[in-house]
């Protein structure tokens, strides 16, 4: 898992989030860059050129597919990073971060059997970014104090950890409440499914991968008692989402 980051590093030098408005592209990118810098320094960050090339060969067609479908504006494509960060963690997890960063754990890569299954998860996370779900979720909290904004950043990082790691990083009821605000709404999850499905098809991947990956996650949801599938905590499966597929 990603190593625990000191609380003090999360609150210093944060971009201004405005007053009650969604975060601007510039502010979201700066926030994402700061989080990425912390993750790059983490000992569990994995720099593997071969694996990165494999992931890029999936990621880049998805980004182009989103652009072709009109989901990704030229401004957003230019100003966001569109980079992948790989974690050594064996838990099954992937997560979108502000500013166009995508985090993927080795555990997720190890359970997929096809590129199409992995593409389905990456397309879903990409759609959270293109639809500005992070900005919309955090914009609702723009009046919070800098300390709580820092807690939100730690909450994002904790999403890449086990439940125990998240508990260690986020302390106090207010901070836990801040973390909960980062969970995408049910409508956002379904929107990311729908748009991600289309993007995946546009990029030339077999959309059956979406269905088979959902099946794996559904099976894991019924069997998971060890916390090794944190993706299911941040992306709970519902009968509606399954029916949409």
Label every model-predicted segment.
Residues 2-159, 178-184, 191-235, 239, ...:
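Peri-catalytic and regulatory segments of divalent metal-dependent proteins
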Residues 94, 98, 165-171:
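Flexible hinge/switch segments at interdomain interfaces of large molecular machines
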Residues 159-165:
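Short hydrophobic alpha-helical membrane-entry/anchor segments
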Residues 171-173, 187-191:
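Active-site-adjacent, His/Asp/Glu-enriched structural segments that form or flank metal-binding
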